[in-house]
Curated annotation (Swiss-Prot):
Binds to sodium channels (Nav) and affects the channel activation process. Expressed by the venom gland. It comes from Androctonus crassicauda. The lineage of its organism: Eukaryota, Metazoa, Ecdysozoa, Arthropoda, Chelicerata. Has the structural arrangement of an alpha-helix connected to antiparallel beta-sheets by disulfide bonds (CS-alpha/beta). Residues 3-28 form the LCN-type CS-alpha/beta domain. It is found in: Secreted. This is Toxin a. Belongs to the long (3 C-C) scorpion toxin superfamily.
Length: 28
């Protein structure tokens, strides 16, 4: 799951860069 916030998106609409912990995706 993406954490809402101001972050760039990759071509799949996922935050990048990010760190994935379990089922959670933390945008950094």
């Amino acid at each position: 799951a993406d954490v809402p916030g101001n972050y760039p998106l990759d071509s799949y609409g996922n935050c990048y860069p990010c760190t994935i912990l379990g089922d959670n995706q933390y945008c950094i």
